[in-house]
Design a protein with these regions (language model features):
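Boundary/entry segment of secreted carbohydrate-active catalytic domains
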Residues: 27-86
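Catalytic cores of secreted or luminal carbohydrate-active enzymes
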Residues: 360-364, 368-430
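Polysaccharide-binding and catalytic clefts of secreted carbohydrate-active enzymes
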Residues: 141-300, 304-307
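Carbohydrate-binding surface patches
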Residues: 421-476, 483-485, 532
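C-terminal beta-strand-rich structural cap/linker in extracellular carbohydrate-active enzymes
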Residues: 503-539
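Acidic/aromatic-lined carbohydrate-recognition and catalytic surfaces
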Residues: 64-171, 182-192, 199-202, 245
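Solvent-exposed beta-hairpin/edge-strand motifs
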Residues: 468-505
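Catalytic-core region of carbohydrate-active enzymes that cleave or remodel glycosidic bonds
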Residues: 99, 103-105, 260, 267-280, ...
Length: 539
């Protein structure tokens, strides 16, 4: 009878590996054995990107915020076995938060945005602000307080942002996350902003240097007029939709130039505050998880996601598709829903998202205090009972995450032909409609174990994994062990955290393959909840 056992040590696992092995394949015809790790390529996810076995926790504000707040940042953080505290805005309480985070040995990444207050810990937003074409302050309209957006050409806002960055680094922050990274450039491109007082003044001189007199005559613009105001000129024409496209393009180019200079300044400020050592900057790459001209400067992305815009295929495209144009990594936020109350499937759906994101070589932030509803609805706070086993599983077996790269994926609509294998290394069979398989290897290693992540997005059922051993370890002897998360138990989890014995957060099960006449191996996989990892080891 097969029994589940806690993982005690590498030597203990080695005992299992040595107990299940298979002789080398007899190669038919001109088919030569190979090793799938030869196809793996190392990824550069960006300066400062988290470890692949990290657990990212986010508390947008320090909690409890008041006596009525039932949530507590630092009592909740260890329940998910967190290694990082990311994307934190609480400027007035930074010394307390960063100090406590550092004392726990965790990585801390503070956040800045387009709506920084004039003073650290303050609430007034007047200095150095962007304006719309009619002269009103540009604001983030989806937030109840309608905070005013900064003008990146303004020395006042540059100073405000620099002060925030400098203070975070001084207190011990390890990195900076930038929310709404498009600032007033994005306001000009997508909304009605981009006409802050400083930008408006500087654009007249910039336009004179970057356009010809003939162009300006065609636009009916006279830059020699004292106190020419581009904002007023556009307003007189009826708004940006009524100005020549080439002029609009130049205005956006000017704002983008200022934005990139703004971030270059903040990088220098952070490095100076850090003793001359560069500090990683990430930025919000939106719920579409895309790199824009205003975000490509960042070292890596921290992206929001939505339930209606996330799937195995989307995660694959975002984090591990061989055809990604920009190789920088993304840390994903858990999927957001747009109703006032969580949908019935929020927990299983989110668990599958978390597992798939890790399986494909990225991280998903713990679903706790991570986004605000546009309509002012309550924030979502997932519990340890719902999600801690998934994150604990990652902490239990970091050696099966670090250094590994996706070399083959299937299921969830992922096109296997993109991987250029003559034959699929693994095939799913049986009740596998919702199963996603990700084969991961350490590039070029002939001896490191291969891992096969399996995530079931449907109601868990047993299914079969067909394994072509001619493509693994040159057809040599192998052993198979299935790792799954230890079920959540509050007392056990608290004990494990207190004693740092994280390997007890995974269970291991020996798998005995069935050899078929075609030479391939069949592995019967038990129901997953929703995640399992097969470790394929060379004997």
């Amino acid at each position: 009878m097969i029994k589940f056992k806690f993982i005690r040590s590498i030597s203990f696992i080695s005992f299992f590996i040595s107990s299940v092995c298979f002789s080398s394949m007899h190669v038919k015809g001109d088919e030569e054995p190979s090793h799938i790790a030869e196809s793996a390529r190392a990824s550069n996810r960006g300066f400062g990107y988290p470890k692949l076995s990290d657990v990212s926790f986010s508390s947008r504000r320090f909690r409890p915020e008041n006596q009525k707040d039932p949530h507590d940042t630092f009592s909740t953080l260890p329940r998910f076995f967190s290694t990082r505290l990311d994307w934190v805005y609480d400027y007035g309480n930074q010394e307390n938060i960063i100090g406590r985070t550092n004392a726990l040995g965790l990585n801390y990444n503070g956040a800045i945005s387009s709506i920084l207050p004039d003073e650290i810990g303050g609430f007034v937003r007047i200095r150095g602000r962007d304006r719309s074409v009619n002269g009103d302050l540009s604001v983030l309209a989806h937030l109840p307080s309608k905070p005013a957006i900064g003008d990146v050409w303004s020395k006042q806002y540059i100073k405000i942002a620099s002060n925030h960055v400098r203070e975070m680094i001084r207190l011990g922050a390890d990195g900076i996350q930038v929310d709404d990274p498009g600032m007033n450039y994005a306001e000009a491109v997508y909304r009605e902003g981009g006409y802050g007082d400083t930008s408006n003044e500087k654009f007249s001189l910039w336009l004179k240097q970057n356009s010809s007199k003939k162009q300006r005559r065609n636009w009916s613009i006279d830059l020699d007029i004292d106190e020419f105001s581009y904002r007023e000129w556009v307003h007189s024409k009826g708004g940006k939709d009524h100005i020549p496209p080439d002029l609009k393009e130049l205005h956006e180019k000017f704002l983008l130039e200022g934005l990139l200079q703004f971030y270059e300044t903040l990088r220098k400020v952070a490095a100076e505050a850090n003793g001359g050592v560069q500090v990683p900057f990430s930025c919000n790459t939106s719920s579409n998880v895309v790199w824009k001209d205003y975000s490509k400067w960042a070292d890596f992305g921290m992206a929001e996601t939505r339930m209606n815009n996330i799937s195995p295929m989307k995660i694959w495209r975002w984090v591990c598709s061989p055809e990604r144009k920009i190789g920088k990594g993304h840390v994903l936020c858990p999927p957001r829903y747009d109703a006032l109350t969580p949908p019935a499937n929020i927990v299983p759906f989110t668990r599958s998202c978390i597992a798939t994101t890790y399986a494909m070589g990225s991280l998903m932030i713990v679903p706790w205090d991570v986004w605000q509803k546009n309509n002012g609805g309550p924030r979502y706070f997932g519990t340890a009972e719902e999600y801690a086993d998934i994150y604990g599983f990652v902490r239990a077996i970091p050696e099966l995450f670090e250094g590994y790269e996706a070399v083959f994926c299937r299921g969830g609509g992922i096109p296997t032909s993109i991987y250029k294998f003559n034959k699929s290394p693994v095939v799913l069979q049986g009740n596998h409609d919702g199963v996603v398989a990700v084969v991961r290897c350490i590039p070029k290693s002939e001896s490191a174990p291969v891992v096969i992540h399996l995530v079931d997005w449907n109601k868990p059922q047993s299914f079969t994994l067909i394994f072509d051993q001619t493509q693994f370890f040159f057809g040599n002897k192998m052993a198979f062990n299935l790792f799954t998360p230890t079920a959540y138990d509050q007392n056990l989890h608290e004990k494990i955290y207190a004693e740092s014995i994280f390997n007890q957060l995974a269970l291991v099960k020996e798998l005995t393959p069935e050899r078929h006449p075609d030479g391939k191996l069949r592995l019967l996989i038990p129901p997953l909840n929703p995640w399992g990892i097969i470790k394929v080891s060379l004997k």
